[in-house]
Amino acid sequence: EEKSGLYRKPSCGEMSAMHACPMNFAPVCGTDGNTYPNECSLCFQRQNTKTDILITKDDRC
């Protein structure tokens, strides 16, 4: 688990091979102020927007 200050970098792994996220609900709060249903969803957003969104906490924002 890599931390950047108080924020945690999501473990996205090899996202290019993944096209869908699991439906498990484990909300994480991103540095963009959005709540994501799980870490995979945040990774998907990172990849789509090419932004370095980190996790501020393992809960809703």
From Swiss-Prot:
Q: Does the keyword Hydrolase apply?
A: no
A Pfam family it matches = Kazal_1
Give each disulfide bond as a residue pair. Answer: 12-43, 21-40, 29-61
Q: Which Gene3D superfamilies match?
A: 3.30.60.30
Site label Reactive bond, positions: 23-24
Kazal-like domain: which residues?
Answer: 6-61
Q: Which UniProt keywords apply?
A: Disulfide bond, Protease inhibitor, Secreted, Serine protease inhibitor
Where is this gene product found? Secreted
* InterPro entries recorded: Bifunctional_prot_inhibitor, Kazal_dom, Kazal_dom_sf, Prot_inh_Kazal-m
Among its keywords, does the record have Transferase?
no
Any single Gene Ontology cellular-component annotation: extracellular region
What is this protein identified as?
A: Probable pancreatic secretory proteinase inhibitor
Please spell out the taxonomic lineage of the organism that makes this protein: Eukaryota, Metazoa, Chordata, Craniata, Vertebrata
